[in-house]
């Protein structure tokens, strides 16, 4: 990155350049396990420093369970909530539940919102599924009277053999919230 009068000149790995006004530096995440005393237990860590746990959230230490961001899976609020529910059902409700990661809603709360849940068209095709793809570009109903020209883009991926929605991808107002509701239906 080189500062220029209009922002920054970014040199890409292929040698090409582009001028940008904003740079987002995403440095990643690491588990915050310092001070927990795990070194005095049988708990093991993976190569990235995340706690290893099985499908029931059991670590190598019989009295220690691990779930959420410290286990290295998708670091999303809906995942942590679903893991907590599965853990509670299994360990306190006598109803064994295994976490299902298939339809995790994700959102980028930017302007406009970006939301997604389920499979992408590419990943569904890689599974050999015959698909129906539905795309829509529309003005949200809440803007009918306001006169705002904000648009929403939506794409549904449907398994043709079952007529089941297996993916939803959306850009527009409240996309993250809408995808969370769709995840429940899916």
Residue ranges with predicted function:
Residues 1-8, 74, 78-107, 111:
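Glycine-rich flavin
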Residues 2-4, 46, 157-161:
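Short beta-strand micro-motifs enriched in acidic
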Residues 3-8, 61, 147-152:
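A short, glycine/Asx- and small/polar-enriched loop/turn
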Residues 4-10, 43-52, 139:
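Short gly/ser/thr-rich secondary-structure transition/capping motifs
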Residues 4-18, 23:
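Conserved beta-strand-loop-beta-strand element in the redox core of flavoprotein oxidoreductases
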Residues 12-14, 55, 160:
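Short acidic, glycine-rich loop/turn motifs
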Residues 17-93, 184:
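FAD-site-proximal beta/loop scaffold in flavoenzymes
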Residues 92-93, 104, 109-186:
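Flexible, glycine-rich terminal cap/loop adjacent to redox cofactors
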């Amino acid at each position: 990155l080189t500062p220029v009068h209009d922002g920054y000149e970014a040199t890409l790995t292929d040698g090409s350049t582009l001028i940008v006004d904003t740079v987002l530096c995403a440095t990643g995440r690491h588990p915050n396990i310092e001070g927990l005393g795990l070194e005095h237990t049988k708990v093991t860590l993976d190569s990235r420093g995340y706690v290893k746990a099985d499908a029931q959230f059991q670590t190598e230490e019989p009295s220690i369970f691990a779930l959420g961001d410290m286990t290295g899976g998708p670091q999303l609020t809906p995942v942590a909530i679903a893991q907590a529910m599965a853990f509670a059902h299994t360990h306190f409700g006598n109803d064994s539940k295994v976490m299902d990661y298939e339809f995790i809603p994700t959102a980028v709360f930017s302007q406009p919102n970006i939301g997604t849940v389920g499979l992408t068209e590419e990943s569904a095709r890689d599974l050999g599924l015959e698909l129906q793809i539905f795309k829509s570009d529309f003005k949200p109903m809440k803007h009918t009277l306001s006169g705002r020209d904000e648009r929403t883009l939506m794409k549904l991926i449907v398994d043709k053999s079952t007529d089941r929605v297996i993916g939803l991808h959306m850009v527009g107002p409240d996309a993250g919230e809408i995808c969370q509701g769709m995840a429940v239906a899916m």
